[in-house]
Amino acid sequence: MSEGLFKKLEEVQRKLAERIVERPLEVSKIKTVGAVDVSYRDERARAAFVLCSFPDCELLKQRVVEVDVSFPYIPTFFFLRETRPVLIALGKERPDVLLVEGHGRAHPRGYGLASHIGLVLGIPTIGISKRLLRGTPEGSWVKVGKAYVSVGHLIDLPSAVEVVKTLNKNGYPLPLRIADRLSRGHTSWSGGVNDEH
């Protein structure tokens, strides 16, 4: 990628970040939580979406899709690579909250995949990651178990943390653990809540 294009993409990202809304979400009114994760093999993406009840986390739906990848891997621009597979996996589903395996506001420019998906769909999203990016601003995340939690869109950090704590099993939110297994090639989820990640 040329430096000129890199700078333009950074500027687009910063402008999109200004459109992110952080506000409290009434967690007691949440009925469904979705989760999405994407894995790669060669130049194909395998995206998994699961829908669970909240707060008891009963698996309601699962969907796995495989698509060609049209954008290269570029650190901090993951949203350009993963948005299409994620949206195809979601289809018409619109959970009350969506957990995204990727960053939200916990991003050097305050706009990761979770923020982009939330902005595109107009639904509350939470970014979940196992590690932080270099240059991530302090105060943009909270660690819950093994997960770095950040605002995606239409939720604030305390509400996001409450949702993730409710779903936390063995250090990571159960819906994302299920989506992770499906995206990596498992045909279905047969584990209980204590199944290892």
From Swiss-Prot:
Protein origin, superkingdom: Archaea
Chief localization: cytoplasm
Presence of the UniProt keyword NADP in the record: no
Cysteines engaged in disulfide bonds, as pairs: none
Keyword Manganese on entry: no
Compartment(s) where it occurs, according to its Swiss-Prot or TrEMBL record: Cytoplasm
Gene3D superfamilies hit by this protein: archaeoglobus fulgidus dsm 4304 superfamily
GO biological process, one term: DNA repair
Binding site for Mg(2+): D37, E101
Alphabetized UniProt keyword annotations: Cytoplasm, DNA damage, DNA repair, Endonuclease, Hydrolase, Magnesium, Metal-binding, Nuclease
EC number in record: 3.1.21.7
Reactions accelerated catalytically: Endonucleolytic cleavage at apurinic or apyrimidinic sites to products with a 5'-phosphate
GO annotation, cellular component aspect: cytoplasm
Site entry (Interaction with target DNA), positions: Y73
Cofactor: Mg(2+)
Function: DNA repair enzyme involved in the repair of deaminated bases. Selectively cleaves double-stranded DNA at the second phosphodiester bond 3' to a deoxyinosine leaving behind the intact lesion on the nicked DNA.
Entry-linked HAMAP family: Endonuclease_5 (MF_00801)
Similarity-based family: Belongs to the endonuclease V family.
PANTHER family per record: ENDONUCLEASE V
Protein name (Swiss-Prot/TrEMBL): Endonuclease V
Organism name: Thermococcus kodakarensis (strain ATCC BAA-918 / JCM 12380 / KOD1)
Gene this protein is translated from: nfi
